From Swiss-Prot:
Catalyzes the oxidation of either pyridoxine 5'-phosphate (PNP) or pyridoxamine 5'-phosphate (PMP) into pyridoxal 5'-phosphate (PLP). Pathway: Cofactor metabolism; pyridoxal 5'-phosphate salvage; pyridoxal 5'-phosphate from pyridoxamine 5'-phosphate: step 1/1; Cofactor metabolism; pyridoxal 5'-phosphate salvage; pyridoxal 5'-phosphate from pyridoxine 5'-phosphate: step 1/1. Its EC number is 1.4.3.5. Its cofactor is FMN. Substrate binds at R7, E8, D9, Y10, K65, Y122, R126, S130, R189, L190, H191. Binds 1 FMN per subunit. One of its GO terms (biological process) is pyridoxine biosynthetic process. Belongs to the pyridoxamine 5'-phosphate oxidase family. This is Pyridoxine/pyridoxamine 5'-phosphate oxidase.
C-alpha cells in the first residue's frame, strides 16, 4: 500500500509564546475547552504509553477523567497490561490529538495510583452496566469466547442487583507531569511547538524547532 501522497497542509491557527499561559496546566485547560467547544470528536481521548518490566513499550487509548493542579487522571484495571506496566515502571507519556484544530499535546511524567477514596467516588458515578463490566473483565487476559464474558457480567449482576462495589483491581492513576508540549500545525511543516519543562519547582517555557 503506497501512502506517500496522503498529507495535509495545516493553516488554521498559530501559537506564539505570547498566547501561552505561564502554567502548562492552565494552557492545557484552555486548549481542551476550545476542543470541547469546537465539538472535536472524543476530546478527552488520550494515548497512554508505558514500558513493561522487560523494557517493551505498549500504548493504548483511554479517556481523561480529570485534570487538576496535580496532573492528569484516568481509570483502568490494575491487572491489565498497562496497569502492570505502570506499576513496574511508574512513568508514562500521553498524547492528545485534536485534528479538527490541527493540534496535539504531549505530556510526560511520573505515575501514581489514585487514593482509594477517589477511585471509589468515581466508580460510584459510572453506569451500572459499566460497573458490572469492571468485575467481569480480566482485562488483557485471553478468553475462549465472548460468551464467557457475557456470562460473567450476568453473574455479577445477580450477585449485585443494586449496588456494585469497586473491584480492588480497578482504580485510577494520576500522571504528574514534568514536561508538556503544545503542537500547532502550520503551513510548510513549520509547525509551532511550545514546550514546558519543570525545573527546580518552576516551569520553563521554550520554543522547539519543528
Amino acid at each position: 500500500m503506497d501512502l506517500h501522497n496522503i498529507r495535509e497542509d495545516y493553516s488554521k491557527r498559530e501559537l506564539s509564546e505570547g498566547d501561552c499561559a505561564d502554567n502548562p496546566i492552565e494552557q492545557f485547560e484552555r486548549w481542551l475547552d476550545e476542543a470541547v467547544r469546537a465539538e472535536v470528536n472524543e476530546p478527552t481521548a488520550v494515548n497512554v504509553a508505558a514500558v513493561d518490566g522487560r523494557g517493551r513499550p505498549n500504548s493504548r487509548m483511554v479517556l481523561l477523567k480529570e485534570v487538576n493542579s496535580e496532573g492528569f487522571v484516568f481509570f483502568t484495571n490494575y491487572h491489565s497490561r498497562k496497569g502492570r506496566s505502570l506499576d513496574a515502571h511508574p512513568f508514562a507519556a500521553m498524547t492528545f490529538f485534536w485534528p479538527e484544530l490541527e493540534r496535539q499535546v504531549r505530556v510526560e511524567g511520573r505515575v501514581e495510583r489514585l487514593a482509594e477514596k477517589l477511585s471509589d467516588e468515581y466508580f460510584e458515578s459510572r453506569p451500572y452496566q459499566s460497573r458490572l463490566g469492571a468485575w467481569a473483565s480480566a482485562q488483557s487476559e485471553v478468553i475462549p469466547n465472548k460468551a464467557v464474558l457475557v456470562a460473567k457480567a450476568a453473574a455479577v449482576g445477580l450477585k449485585h442487583p443494586l449496588h456494585v462495589p469497586r473491584p480492588p483491581h480497578w482504580g485510577g492513576y494520576i500522571v504528574i507531569p514534568d514536561l508538556l508540549e503544545f503542537w500547532q500545525g502550520r503551513p510548510s511543516r513549520l509547525h509551532d511547538r511550545i514546550q514546558y519543562r519543570l525545573l527546580d519547582g518552576g516551569w520553563i517555557r521554550e520554543r522547539l524547532s519543528p
